[in-house]
């Protein structure tokens, strides 16, 4: 598999495209919010010769799903997926956008509701395991590739930080507990691909993230 990333919208959301060797791919958090950004995504996929099979949202906040409508209109056969616990957010995406001054097309309801332990498979070698880590939102998920030693974490964790928990459905204790039990138990050299900002690693966050309970001091 190959992991690509593009940065979209004023919130600088990382949109990830994970491609199997045969070109089938999954689009994670399409965040393109303007015609120019939509063209960037469409042209990137065309230039790489990719064929989108999945659209997966790590969570239902509008900045991460603002491109869902465009993706579903462009690739009509794409399968859409998210965690059911964020459905209430996704059903009100246009209202979320209005609060922040954005016009957001209401995306289709996810066709597949993912849960902890599920897998997303595509092409001849695309395989991502799902972990449910609520706290930033009730239905936040991360997608892990053991083979590639990478995990896409949405807004669950960032470099030396974690996702905010003051939005509807947020829960700080749940977030930290999930990070400790499901992310910090991954191999230390696992690359962490967040929803905003630069890449990090499990080892780096264990050493330097001030929000983790069992932070290493050596």
What are these model-predicted stretches?
Residues 1-48, 142-153:
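Conserved beta-strand hairpin/beta-sheet module of binuclear metal-dependent hydrolase folds
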Residues 32-126, 207-215:
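Active-site HxH/HxHxD metal-binding segment of metal-dependent hydrolases
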Residues 32-33, 96, 119, 125-218:
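Metallo-beta-lactamase
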Residues 26-29, 54-57, 130-132:
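Short catalytic-loop micro-motif centered on adjacent basic/acidic residues
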Residues 10-12, 114, 137-138:
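Short acidic/glycine-enriched loop/turn segments that link adjacent beta-strands
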Residues 6, 114, 133:
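Hydrophobic residues at beta-strand termini and immediately following loops
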Residues 14, 24, 51, 79, ...:
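Residues at the starts of beta-strands that form the adenosine-phosphate
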């Amino acid at each position: 598999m190959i992991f690509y990333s593009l940065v979209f919208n004023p919130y600088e959301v990382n949109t990830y495209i994970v491609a199997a060797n045969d070109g089938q791919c999954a689009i994670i958090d399409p965040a393109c919010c303007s015609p120019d950004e939509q063209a960037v995504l469409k042209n990137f996929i065309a230039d790489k010769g990719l064929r989108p099979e999945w659209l997966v949202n790590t969570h239902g906040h509008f900045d991460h799903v603002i491109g869902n409508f465009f993706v579903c209109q462009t690739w009509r056969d794409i399968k859409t997926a998210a965690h059911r616990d964020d459905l209430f957010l996704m059903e009100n995406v246009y209202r979320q956008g209005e609060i922040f001054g954005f016009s957001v097309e209401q995306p289709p309801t996810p066709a597949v509701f993912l849960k902890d332990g599920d897998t997303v498979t595509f092409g001849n070698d695309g395989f991502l395991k799902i972990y449910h880590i609520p706290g930033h939102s009730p239905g936040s998920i991360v997608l892990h590739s053991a083979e590639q030693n990478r995990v896409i974490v949405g807004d669950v964790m960032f470099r030396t930080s974690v996702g905010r928990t003051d939005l509807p459905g947020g829960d700080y204790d749940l977030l930290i507990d999930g990070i400790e039990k499901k992310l910090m138990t991954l191999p230390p050299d696992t690359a962490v691909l967040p929803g905003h900002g630069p890449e990090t690693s499990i080892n780096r966050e264990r050493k330097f993230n001030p929000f983790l309970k069992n932070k290493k001091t050596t």
